[in-house]
Design a protein with these regions (language model features):
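Catalytic-loop region of hydrolases
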Residues: 1-70
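N-terminal cap/lid subdomain of alpha/beta-hydrolase-fold enzymes
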Residues: 2-3, 48-132
């Protein structure tokens, strides 16, 4: 199992953040709920050994959530977070970029509503692997 040196189980306190938002897709306003949180991984002895961080977007006006599709996405790891998957094309907001060239590849970027977001048809969970 991959274990990061920066993970200190004795002092680690999992974080959790929640918010509500709205995005307009194809002229329709879509409400959603976001949960961003640490997910602790426990070893065979029951002690925490690592953590992954997730960004979850749930459409909040859906009545039948049992049949709603969920997209799970991650980018590499260890050492490669889901930042470009998240802020590049799957999140409800994304970086604004017209053409990415060598000089502008590292920003700064403006952040805009993502017109190609999938939240209208599926919930989205973005995963930062251990060590990112």
């Amino acid at each position: 199992m991959y274990k990061t040196e920066s993970f200190k189980p004795d002092t680690f306190k999992p974080a959790r953040f929640e918010s509500d938002g709205k995005i307009t897709l194809s002229g329709k306003e879509i409400p959603y709920h976001t949960i961003c949180e640490d997910n602790v991984i426990y070893g065979p002895d029951g002690n925490p050994v690592a953590s992954i961080f997730t960004y979850a977007y749930f459409r909040s006006d859906v009545e039948d959530t049992a049949n709603r599709p969920v997209v799970f996405a991650y980018n590499g790891g260890p050492g490669s977070s889901c930042m470009y998957v998240h802020a590049g094309f799957l999140g409800t907001r994304r970086m604004q970029y017209d053409e990415v060239d060598r000089e502008s590849a590292f920003g700064p970027y403006k952040v805009i509503d993502n017109p190609d977001c999938l939240i209208d048809v599926a919930d989205i969970v973005l995963i930062d692997p251990v060590g990112t």
